[in-house]
Amino acid sequence: MGEPSPSRRRSITSGIPCPSPTKQVLPPPPPEELHNILRKRPRSSAIPTTSQTHVRAPRKETDVVDRIWHDIDEEQREKLARRKEEAAKRKEQQPAQHIRDYLPLTATNLRNFRNEDSTISDFIHRQGMVDKLLGYKMLLGKMENCGTLGYEKMSEDEVQQLSREWLKNFFPSEQAHVGPRTPPSPAVDSDGGSYPKRPRRGPKTPPGSPGPSMDQAAVNRRELIEQLARNFGISSYKVEETLGTGLDKALEDCSKKLKNELMETFKDQLLSQIDRKTKIRDDLSDQMELVSDCSLSPDLIKKEEPDVVYHMAVPPPPIPPPIQPPPYSYYPVAPAAAPQVYHYAPPPPPPPPHPQQGLYQQNMMAYPPPMQHFNAPPPPMAPYQHQAPPSIVLPPVNVPPPPIGVRIDTPIPTAVLPIPTMVPPPPLPPPQAPFSGDCWRAQPAAPVPASVPVSSAPPPSVVVNVQSTLFSALGLHHKPPPPPPPPPPPTTSSTTTSHIPPPPPPPLPFSSAPPPPPPLPMVAAGPSPPSFVPPPPPPNPNQNPSIVLSPSAVTGGGGYRHRVNQFPPQQQQSFSNF
């Protein structure tokens, strides 16, 4: 709907009826931006109409809007008028600020607070002396002398007069007695020195200031006089007049005696206290020394006790046996010349093709007469050598139990064969074809000062294969000669063995083979030809009739196997048939 024309708007606001038959009423236009809030109600036209008589009646919507604006304006006017009235009343009712009232917390008052002295002046101008003292204390920060407060020293007459008033106030119960109240004697007044000093009226110094306290002599004298007057039923004046100066002297003497007695008592108490503290201190020091000694002694005992117990209880450690590898051996250690049987040796071997047959053949080869030494050369490559301290003969009790799965039913010699404790050698090479011939070879001596036990015969299955060759070569059908003297100690030893004294040799089988050839001179060990061994030279009477058995140096022979790098340097026994 379009905006009404100005003429129509004027007719609506003025209340003139519209010529249109419908008489449509439009809302008033919105107020302008700079419309005054305190606007007045629009005046009606000067033309007298019938509607002017009913202006106050809300016959039209425009009257309701104007009334709302008018109510708002009236509320604002009332608020402004009320504020003005309250401000005027506050100014009228605000009294003059008293000196002792607190100042308002304004910036100016806070700035001048250091120089503000209204409270100080109020205290200073009061009538009470304590208030004035507090005022000066606040003003100057310290207690001033009475002269600063305006007080003057009193004369003697004023002091006496005040003293009488003070005595009246001090002894109100003695008013019924007849006579003056302890008048001073003229002699005492003339002298002026013996009259008891009484506290004067008026403050000489402010309370709390240093100085002599009030003399209690007069009080004590007055109490004594009153007590005497009550006891004798006379007035205190008569008592004082009768005693005269004797009372003062008695009081002085009594006071001196009391002072001396008190001083002596205090001195004795102090000395006893000091002695007691000194004694306690000495006792404490002694106790502390004892405690310190007691505390130190257990530490020394604790420090020395482990060593003493160790030296007393722990014997010298025995020489430990050589450390064994995981595989265990069940027999004592044998000398180097003895055959080396390892713990993993199976039970009796099968027929000759089995590699273990050579081992038993070596056992038979090393079955010479007792107490004879064999010299074995070192192999080309020495196996692992286990260095150990000197061995100790250990009983079989120390042998650990056999592991599970290992059989120990292998027939062993009558005299238990020593078994080495070194690391097992490398695997055996394939066997070589045997040949018939002699296998004697002179070898350099590498002896070990140990006796070789004589063992019983090996199983029959092995003896059958080597009897014809070994017994005929060794000539065991003759009685063996006595053993030669022991050779010098060896320079190197690859194994550490323990020895067991050999039992007497068992009877040996008889062999009709011819005696062995004479011994050969000592020569160095070396590989021999694979196919032929030269015969031995004729016997030499000047040569030591001892030969050396060296199976490891021979590569072939009847019933022998060549074993290289299998055993460490062994010691073999030599013997002679002559």
Swiss-Prot record:
Stretches the record annotates as Disordered: 1-62, 173-216, 426-457, 474-578
GO cellular component terms given for this protein: nuclear speck
Keywords of this entry: mRNA processing, Nucleus
Biased composition (Pro residues): 481-491, 500-542
GO biological process, one term: mRNA processing
Biased segments, Low complexity type: 444-455, 565-578
Location of the protein in the cell: Nucleus; Nucleus speckle
Tissue-wise expression: Expressed in germline, oocytes, epidermis, pharyngeal bulb and neurons.
Signal peptide: none
Highest taxon of the lineage: Eukaryota
Subunit: May interact (via C-terminus) with ssup-72; the interaction may prevent ssup-72 binding to RNA polymerase II subunit ama-1.
Function, in words: Acts as a negative regulator of nuclear pre-mRNA 3'-end processing (mRNA polyadenylation). Plays a role in tissue-specific expression of protein isoforms by regulating differential processing of pre-mRNA 3'-end (alternative polyadenylation). In neurons, regulates alternative polyadenylation of specific mRNAs including unc-44 and dlk-1 by interacting with phosphatase ssup-72 and thus preventing ssup-72 dephosphorylation of RNA polymerase II subunit ama-1.
Protein name: Synaptic defective enhancer 1
Organism of origin: Caenorhabditis elegans
